[in-house]
């Protein structure tokens, strides 16, 4: 299935399917799940990256177990709107994943997601260790929640 616009992704889902948000980093992949009504994003897990095949296997196991019907990948667009090498890495990951599973995928601008989450954790007086444990999956939830909150603005 091709990469879809966010509105097309939401329209492609059946009533009881969830969305899985991904924050792709070089060392980890943060995961967040929507509820079945696709209203609330919840931090779910963090995958330690190894090889693509192993990462994809773990990711698709979550997709199957949690009733996921589509993926939302954070796209790390630079502040000036330029898509640098990190964006290309996310797009390559999505293309490779699409070869393994016919599943709708959409991108969502993730600018400042990790910064916003880190700031929230600092304000909550979380320890450095605790921040390191949760920042990736919370960033994934921030990305997914952004898409869920903005669906009324889709054309």
Curated annotation (Swiss-Prot):
Please provide the record's keywords in A-Z order. Answer: Cytoplasm, Hydrolase, Nuclease, Ribosome biogenesis
SMART domains referenced in this protein's UniProt entry, alphabetically: YqgFc
Grouped into one coarse class, the protein's main location is cytoplasm
Q: Where does the record place it? A: Cytoplasm
A single Gene Ontology CC annotation of this entry is: cytosol
Domain of life (superkingdom): Bacteria
UniProt keyword annotation of Glycoprotein present: no
Task: Fetch the Gene3D superfamilies from UniProt.
Answer: YqgF/RNase H-like domain
Pfam families membership? RuvX
| One biological process term in Gene Ontology | rRNA 5'-end processing
EC number(s) reported in the record: 3.1.-.-
Instruction: Return one GO MF term.
Output: nuclease activity
List, alphabetically, the PANTHER family matched: POLYNUCLEOTIDYL TRANSFERASE, RIBONUCLEASE H-LIKE SUPERFAMILY PROTEIN
HAMAP family to which the protein is assigned, alphabetical: Nuclease_YqgF
Q: What's this chain's function?
A: Could be a nuclease involved in processing of the 5'-end of pre-16S rRNA.
Q: Which family does it belong to?
A: Belongs to the YqgF nuclease family.
Question: What is the protein name given in its UniProt record?
Answer: Putative pre-16S rRNA nuclease
Q: Which organism is it from?
A: Paramagnetospirillum magneticum (strain ATCC 700264 / AMB-1)
Upper lineage is: Bacteria, Pseudomonadati, Pseudomonadota, Alphaproteobacteria, Rhodospirillales
């Amino acid at each position: 299935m091709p990469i879809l616009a966010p509105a097309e992704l939401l329209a492609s889902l059946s009533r009881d399917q969830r969305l899985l948000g991904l924050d792709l980093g070089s060392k980890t992949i943060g995961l967040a799940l929507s509820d079945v009504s696709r209203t609330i994003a919840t931090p779910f897990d963090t995958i330690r990256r190894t090889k693509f095949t192993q990462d994809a296997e773990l990711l698709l196991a979550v997709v199957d177990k949690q009733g996921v019907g589509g993926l939302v990948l954070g796209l790390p667009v630079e502040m000036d709107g330029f898509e640098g090498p990190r964006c290309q890495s996310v797009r390559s990951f999505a293309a490779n994943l699409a070869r393994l599973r016919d599943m709708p995928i959409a991108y969502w601008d993730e600018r400042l997601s990790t910064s916003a989450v880190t700031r929230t954790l600092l304000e909550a007086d979380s320890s450095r260790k605790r921040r390191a444990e949760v920042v990736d999956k919370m960033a994934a939830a921030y990305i997914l929640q952004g898409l869920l909150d903005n669906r009324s603005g889709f054309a």
